[in-house]
Curated annotation (Swiss-Prot):
PROSITE patterns xrefs: DNAJ_1, DNAJ_2, ZF_CR
InterPro entries cross-referenced by the UniProt entry: DnaJ, DnaJ_C, DnaJ_domain, DnaJ_domain_CS, HSP40/DnaJ_pept-bd, HSP_DnaJ_Cys-rich_dom, HSP_DnaJ_Cys-rich_dom_sf, J_dom_sf
Zinc fingers classed as CR-type: ranges: 132-215
Protein name: Chaperone protein DnaJ
Keywords: Chaperone, Cytoplasm, DNA replication, Metal-binding, Repeat, Stress response, Zinc, Zinc-finger
Gene field: dnaJ
Organism: Peanut witches'-broom phytoplasma
Chain positions of CXXCXGXG motif repeats: 145-152, 162-169, 188-195, 203-210
Family per similarity comment: Belongs to the DnaJ family.
Length: 368
């Protein structure tokens, strides 16, 4: 019986390789030896060998057993194998085939081959993020060349049916796992999903690519409550799909500018107000700015610095749930006056004397 090749040698890795290195090697070699791409006679065997090596080395438990026992370790355990397959391999199948064609084309949930998705970054103000807004963005997308109808050929006589996908625009694949087989369709690497290929001369407008860049303008509805790091999706606003397939989607990464007064934590707003010592001692009513407008806040007598007051439902709406709103918290800061006049100093001295008398009175009364 033929001795199995060392799994590290199969993936062309050292024995201290990191998981990211293992994944990169798997994608590279799987792409290289995939039967639909590689024409070598033993491509199928090498492809399975790469898959087997990855299945073991990408799983922490299996790898540890393999490092100790080599090919003698038991690779048939149900619990660990099934869990490892779901957490790593199944996702890697999708990543593998997306790497073949430069973009994700998995159709486990749909049969159509879509155009590429487009990603942009959008910076908005703090108030726009908490209240919602509309933004018009302009960007370039790839569309079928009108001159050659997306074929890339100079004339229709230069076009032939693709002999790889037989005019289907996609190729089928079957990926064997330990307990499941993955079936799917991927865009044809030969014709790029156009179902046809051309022979020179090429279209002079698109240089044989079949697609040209076109300026695209979209008005986006930004919901109230978004924050930095959120990604919004605008369906069918990405690059045009091949041969009439749906467009890709537009993904918008949100960046929110900071506000000079308000700070946001989750869906709550925090701000500070400055009052003087006699307002804190006697109590007062002050006006407070919120994202929803100006409101009055009652400051009770004897308020101390850093006291926090809650304004219910004056915070940020939850995204896609406008009836759920956070709160606004107001933190009080007490101002100590400087550069006192002689009159003010005398008044403070009188207050100090009264405070001292009051303290002594309380001390004496405690003896009875």
């Amino acid at each position: 019986m033929k001795q199995k090749k060392d799994y590290y040698e199969v993936l062309e890795l050292s024995r201290d390789a990191k998981l990211d290195d293992i994944k990169k090697a798997y994608r590279r070699l799987s792409k290289k030896y995939h039967p639909d791409v590689c024409k070598e006679a033993n491509a199928d065997a090498k492809f399975k060998e790469v898959q087997e090596a990855f299945d073991v080395l990408s799983n922490t438990n299996k790898r540890a057993q393999y490092d100790q026992m080599g090919h003698n370790f038991n690779n048939q355990g149900f619990n660990s194998d099934f869990q490892g397959f779901q957490s790593a391999n199944f996702e890697e199948f999708e990543d593998l085939f997306s790497s073949f064609f430069g973009r994700r084309k998995s159709n486990r949930h749909q049969e159509d081959i879509k155009g590429e998705d487009h990603h942009i970054k959008l910076t908005i103000s703090f108030m726009e993020s908490v209240l919602g807004t509309q933004k018009t963005v302009t960007f370039n997308v790839k569309e079928n060349c009108e001159k050659c109808d997306g074929t890339g050929a100079k004339t229709k006589n230069d076009i032939r049916i693709c002999n790889v996908c037989k005019g289907n625009g996609y190729i089928s694949y079957t990926q064997q796992g330990w307990f499941v087989s993955v079936f799917g369709k991927q865009i044809c690497p030969e014709c790029g999903g156009n179902k046809k290929i051309y022979f020179r001369p090429e279209c002079k407008f698109c240089k044989g690519v079949g697609m040209v860049k076109s300026e695209h303008k979209v008005t986006l509805n930004i919901p109230a409550g978004v924050e930095s790091g959120m990604r919004l999706k605008s369906p069918n606003q990405g690059h045009q799909g091949p041969s009439g397939a749906p467009n890709g989607d537009l993904y918008v990464d949100i960046n929110v500018q900071p506000h000079k007064t308000f700070q946001r934590k989750g869906n709550d707003i925090f701000s500070s107000i400055l009052i003087n010592f006699y307002q804190a001692a006697l109590g007062t009513i002050i006006n407070v700015d919120t994202i929803h407008g100006n409101v009055q806040l009652k400051i009770p007598a004897g308020t101390q610095t850093d006291t926090k007051f809650r304004l219910k439902n004056k915070g940020v709406p939850y995204v896609n749930s406008p009836f759920s709103i956070g709160d606004h918290y107001v933190i009080v800061k007490i101002y100590t006056p400087q550069n006192l006049s002689n009159t003010q100093k005398k008044l403070f001295e009188q207050l100090e004397e009264l405070e001292e008398l009051n303290r002594k009175s309380k001390t004496n009364s405690s003896w009875f």
